[in-house]
Amino acid sequence: METNTARKTILVVDDDPGVLDYASYVLEECGYAVLTAPDGAAALVLLRDHDQIDLLFTDVVMPGLDGVEVARRACQESPRLKVLFTTGYAADVIPAGRLLKKPYRPEQLAGEIAAVLANST
């Protein structure tokens, strides 16, 4: 499943350990470097500690800091950071941004990540 990723780094954030493991496995198989966080607070620490994160892939609905707030804070610090949201809930839970609905297949995740990374805006 490896793609031409130029070793981009993806931060995956999800409070469901099974989803976190699944997404990180799929992305590692695609050739990405992957960091994981089980919640929004841990994600913000990783974002501060690793300045080479190319994309934030975050669940929207999590206890504590939700994915929308994590993305807002992260993009304030790193305006070029790409963001892809995911949720099993209705798409209207995010104000704006790209969304991958759960459950997703490996090829859907890989395709959405590649598309977001390729988008220069």
Where do the language-model regions lie?
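Acidic catalytic/metal-coordinating carboxylates
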Residues: 38-42, 66-70
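Receiver (REC) domain active-site loop signature in two-component systems and cognate sites
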Residues: 62
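Active-site residues of response regulator receiver
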Residues: 59
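C-terminal output helix
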Residues: 104-121
